Each structure stands twice: as C-alpha cells, then as structure tokens.
C-alpha cells in the first residue's frame, strides 16, 4: 500500500 497512509493511519509514505 504505497499511498502514504496505511490502514493503521500512520504516516509512512513508501512502506506497506
């Protein structure tokens, strides 16, 4: 999921 935000609502960016 490279959308910036994961299902957890965390601000990852280019992670799962």
UniProtKB/Swiss-Prot annotation:
The keyword Secreted is assigned to this record: yes
Subcellular location: Secreted, Cell wall
Keyword flag Secreted: yes
One annotated Gene Ontology cellular component of this protein: extracellular region
Source superkingdom: Eukaryota
Keywords (A to Z) from UniProt: Cell wall, Secreted
Name of this chain's protein: 36 kDa cell wall protein
Organism name: Nicotiana tabacum
Upper taxonomic lineage: Eukaryota, Viridiplantae, Streptophyta, Embryophyta, Tracheophyta
């Amino acid at each position: 999921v490279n959308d910036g935000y994961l299902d957890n609502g965390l601000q990852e960016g280019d992670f799962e």
